[in-house]
């Protein structure tokens, strides 16, 4: 084999063939179409060597087995037939691996996903390391696809149909011990002995196929299967609202394989893969994947980042505690928390303890790893321990004089190079830096709640922020596991600015008599994870509406909400889930009682609560205002690109990923259609729907947000 091959064969003295996987020039192994010839050449050598006792496939990369197939291959397909052929080629290659006459072992360390797991499933046995980096899964559904190289057929036969359905329909990734319990792997070992353990397994005679648990055998039979698939179809339809065609095809293909045999199953899998690859949903989901990958590579500015060895946090509340956790436990950086009292510090420490203890209980980490991570977090009621911090994140109340005071204190007590990053959601960063001695080192870093779950952060430089400050802050966000977008220092920044008109319109429809559950259901049907009214309950009605006056002052009446309604709700001490009183009823511990609306809400705002609009009309009214505002943000350069705008909306507020983000969605609709729809709505509901100048210009010139030079392909 040549040195440029991604697959290298070495026959050991004990007659076990070790195939090392190492894609040249890449940090991560991915499967590409051109590798098929390399693998087939190796398989030919293995078949011809009659002295071989077994084969081990192992990665030569430091922390991944195979992270999946190269998604660019799908983008190169011009039609469903070409994509189907791609799947059949993958199926054939996996069949050749499975047909080898000697035991074949997959030795897995790190990510084993998508096509990587399909290759491992084609092996006769699998063994993996107990490392936290080791995860196994089939995430193709997240790209609007299904596993196309035999995964839908081999996985149910190995782990059982219910486990396989759960894994493939959700794309969930199993850690080592979970994979062992499910029967996906045969053993879990330390990384230091992975190869030798795999070699020993390869020397053994091929063992009989694993016997499935009784429950899985019943579910695979005709009666159990019929019941299971009926329930899965119902549950999946409720979850996807029909917006993700891949889920229904996954269920069909798995059922076909079980009912009609694997040959029919493989055929159905390849056909479905080809057809799904051409759907607009898959194209949009792949575009989101490529865009997020590009954003994660974007350094934020041309300047090199400054030092980033330790971080300080001001405020130990909900946001401060969450920021401390992602900084220490995700980023591995020492964190010092300052709060005005020890209760705040203890709250922040408990926040991290609770999250880490949950990981220990679920066996994701060991107790000593929990203690090691927690030791990175310390606290104080003064600035002791802050003198050497490279960056300090402020997470105190939304009060401008207080935040300006924090800037002065940090400049006085920290190093000359220390960056001050404000977690404000509404105050201009330029105002926070107005009295700063070093305004070039002041920046916004807007996290979303809950911090440990929300993937997006907005990085907000003001007019005087230096390029190095931007680069350092972006670097920190990435270390925290976040996807950062750089946005301009204008009221509401980007995410809140496009979210508020959407929520305001939902409140306005409520005052017109539309029912809460009807409004929320309409937007969930459209593709949002929760409706706007429920979202307001979740984030806190007081918190969610606090920014409305700020935006109204900056941009005018189009940001006004029915003030009397908001005031009535807040005056009735309704803050949402956090105090158990909101638009919805809450049971014990803040749990909603089957999403039941509190009927008292209608009397409170003086309406009967009788819906007149269709779900489509409700969704259109909310979404069109969001899209119009997003176009304004693009025009005003609040965001740097359509890419950042799409990622910000998908990751920040759950804009439907299958639509690709607001800018891809507007491109799909066309600027002419956007303008016509907004004009129609403006005639019905008022000037807040008037199409912005950007859309009008684009309609006249027949332009799009995503230019012809920007494609769905990765770089």
Swiss-Prot record:
EC number(s) recorded for this UniProt protein: 4.2.1.17, 5.1.2.3, 1.1.1.35
Molecular function per GO: 3-hydroxybutyryl-CoA epimerase activity; enoyl-CoA hydratase activity; long-chain-3-hydroxyacyl-CoA dehydrogenase activity; NAD+ binding
Any Gene Ontology CC annotation: cytoplasm
Reactions catalysed: a (3S)-3-hydroxyacyl-CoA = a (2E)-enoyl-CoA + H2O; a 4-saturated-(3S)-3-hydroxyacyl-CoA = a (3E)-enoyl-CoA + H2O; a (3S)-3-hydroxyacyl-CoA + NAD(+) = a 3-oxoacyl-CoA + NADH + H(+); (3S)-3-hydroxybutanoyl-CoA = (3R)-3-hydroxybutanoyl-CoA
Region (Enoyl-CoA hydratase): 1-190
Pathway assigned in UniProt: Lipid metabolism; fatty acid beta-oxidation
GO biological process, one term: fatty acid beta-oxidation
Cellular localization per UniProt: Cytoplasm
InterPro entries noted in UniProt: 3-OHacyl-CoA_DH_CS, 3-OHacyl-CoA_DH_NAD-bd, 3HC_DH_C, 6-PGluconate_DH-like_C_sf, ClpP/crotonase-like_dom_sf, Enoyl-CoA_hydra/iso, FA_oxidation_alpha_subunit, FadJ
Residue ranges of the region described as 3-hydroxyacyl-CoA dehydrogenase: 306-715
Positions bearing the site annotation: Important for catalytic activity: 118, 140
Entry keyword set: Cytoplasm, Fatty acid metabolism, Isomerase, Lipid degradation, Lipid metabolism, Lyase, Multifunctional enzyme, NAD, Oxidoreductase
One Pfam match: ECH_1
Subunit structure: Heterotetramer of two alpha chains (FadJ) and two beta chains (FadI).
Classification via NCBIfam families: FadJ, PRK11154.1
Family the UniProt entry places it in: In the N-terminal section; belongs to the enoyl-CoA hydratase/isomerase family. In the central section; belongs to the 3-hydroxyacyl-CoA dehydrogenase family.
Function in brief: Catalyzes the formation of a hydroxyacyl-CoA by addition of water on enoyl-CoA. Also exhibits 3-hydroxyacyl-CoA epimerase and 3-hydroxyacyl-CoA dehydrogenase activities.
Protein name as it appears in the record: Fatty acid oxidation complex subunit alpha
Species whose genome carries this gene: Salmonella dublin (strain CT_02021853)
